[in-house]
Amino acid sequence: MDYGTILEERTNPAVLMNAREQYMRQCARGDPSAASTFAFAHAMIGSKNKLDVKEGIVCLEKLLRDDEDRTSKRNYVYYLAVAHARIKQYDLALGYIDVLLDAEGDNQQAKTLKESIKSAMTHDGLIGAAIVGGGALALAGLVAIFSMSRK
């Protein structure tokens, strides 16, 4: 599959602005819901602006820490991989997708994303250059989260 299919899709600026406004309204009333936070994060990681993508990553990481639902955690990990790949942090992207594949070895969507990330790395001339060490510490926590949620 062409890496552009997943990694190059972008959020329409109007959708991005609407998601931000809805999220900010909920923040003004207190803690935003997980659904609202996820919708905002999903829109942000599709932005062309690297700072927006990073803001989406922060939201997804918070959701991953705070949400107990296993299916939701799976989605957060998947979209964290997408987000990191979009800002060319391929080591972290592969780390997240590998955690997901360790938990769900038959997950075709995750396998496709992994191939897309590798294709993007090749396209960017970075094959074999991803440094897993920096992401290993952050991902160790994810492994623990998935291990605990299996019990």
Curated annotation (Swiss-Prot):
One of its GO terms (cellular component) is mitochondrial outer membrane. It comes from Caenorhabditis elegans. Involved in the fragmentation of the mitochondrial network. Involved in perinuclear clustering of the mitochondrial network. May act, redundantly with fis-1, downstream of mitochondrial fission, before the fission products participate in mitochondrial homeostasis, mitophagy, or apoptosis. Plays a role in apoptosis by promoting mitochondrial elimination and cell-death execution, acting downstream of caspase ced-3, and perhaps independently of dynamin GTPase drp-1, caspase ced-9 and apoptosis-inducing factor AIFM/wah-1. GO terms for molecular function: lipid binding; molecular adaptor activity. The keyword Magnesium does not apply. It is a single-pass membrane protein. The chain crosses the membrane at residues 126-146. Coiled coil: none annotated. The C-terminus is required for mitochondrial or peroxisomal localization, while the N-terminus is necessary for mitochondrial or peroxisomal fission. It is found in: Mitochondrion outer membrane; Peroxisome membrane; Mitochondrion. Disruption phenotype: Mitochondrial connectivity appears normal and also normal in a fis-1 mutant background. Abnormal, but minor, affects on apoptosis, with fewer cell corpses and an increase in cell numbers in a caspase ced-3, ced-4, or dynamin GTPase drp-1 mutant background. Increases number of ectopic cells in a combined ced-3 and drp-1 mutant background. Increases number of ectopic cells in a combined ced-3; ced-9 mutant background, which increases further in a ced-3; ced-9; drp-1 mutant background. The lineage of its organism: Eukaryota, Metazoa, Ecdysozoa, Nematoda, Chromadorea. InterPro entries: Fis1, Fis1_cytosol, Fis1_TPR_C, Fis1_TPR_N, TPR-like_helical_dom_sf. This is FIS1-related protein fis-2. GO terms for biological process: apoptotic process; IRE1-mediated unfolded protein response; mitochondrial fission; peroxisome fission. Keywords: Apoptosis, Membrane, Mitochondrion, Mitochondrion outer membrane, Peroxisome, Transmembrane, Transmembrane helix. PANTHER family: MITOCHONDRIAL FISSION 1 PROTEIN (PTHR13247:SF0), TETRATRICOPEPTIDE REPEAT PROTEIN 11 TPR REPEAT PROTEIN 11 (PTHR13247). Belongs to the FIS1 family.
